[in-house]
Amino acid sequence: MQLVVARIGRAHGIKGEVTVEVRTDEPELRLGPGAVLATEPAATGPLTVEAGRVHSGRLLLRFEGVRDRTGAEALRNTLLIAEVDPDELPEEEDEFYDHQLIDLDVVLADGTGIGRITEISHLPSQDLFIVERPDGSEVMIPFVEEIVTEIDLEEQRAVITPPPGLIDESEAVVASSRDEETGEAASGDEAEAPKGDA
């Protein structure tokens, strides 16, 4: 089975290095020297990792046969794809591969159906579930433990406790309308700090 493990970004320097947007929790395994990766578009690959290093918090890779900036620029936006045993599981219990999450039913804690995961979007700050609603619309759900409280692979479902407005925009609380409804806060009142991680 194939998994997207990275996307190639800009060229770095003049010796063929590229920046890489990592899409795996195991970059040292999937993107280490000697790794042979399929590509999308397929005509670009396969690519073999020659060397890698971290520079200013970003992973830089150099591929065999790519020796200059021009060659590196030609790889921009290419997806890197690793072949993975479908029975292989991530090392950590609370980690999942994309293929394990695609097609899971998304439900609220009370069992109310929200939709089905159709895609996982890997952003620098967090991952997002792209969920297709029964009416065909899509909603994006951050894959963070405060919102996604349970992944049950046996039952094929993801249980969520979304904040107001995430699923149903009519539930969203807008600061200006809230002030109009409750009146202006007394000048001596202090705002309560939001709950959660500081």
Curated annotation (Swiss-Prot):
Coiled coil: none annotated. Signal peptide: none annotated. The keyword Glycoprotein does not apply. It comes from the Bacteria. GO terms for molecular function: ribosome binding. GO terms for cellular component: cytoplasm; ribosome. Residues 181-191 have a biased composition (Acidic residues). Residues 160-198 are annotated as: Disordered. Residues 92-166 form the PRC barrel domain. It is found in: Cytoplasm. GO terms for biological process: ribosomal small subunit biogenesis; rRNA processing. Pfam families: PRC_RimM, RimM. Keywords: Chaperone, Cytoplasm, Ribosome biogenesis, rRNA processing. Its main location: cytoplasm. Belongs to the RimM family. An accessory protein needed during the final step in the assembly of 30S ribosomal subunit, possibly for assembly of the head region. Essential for efficient processing of 16S rRNA. May be needed both before and after RbfA during the maturation of 16S rRNA. It has affinity for free ribosomal 30S subunits but not for 70S ribosomes. Binds ribosomal protein uS19. The PRC barrel domain binds ribosomal protein uS19. This is Ribosome maturation factor RimM. It comes from Streptomyces griseus subsp. griseus (strain JCM 4626 / CBS 651.72 / NBRC 13350 / KCC S-0626 / ISP 5235). The gene is rimM.
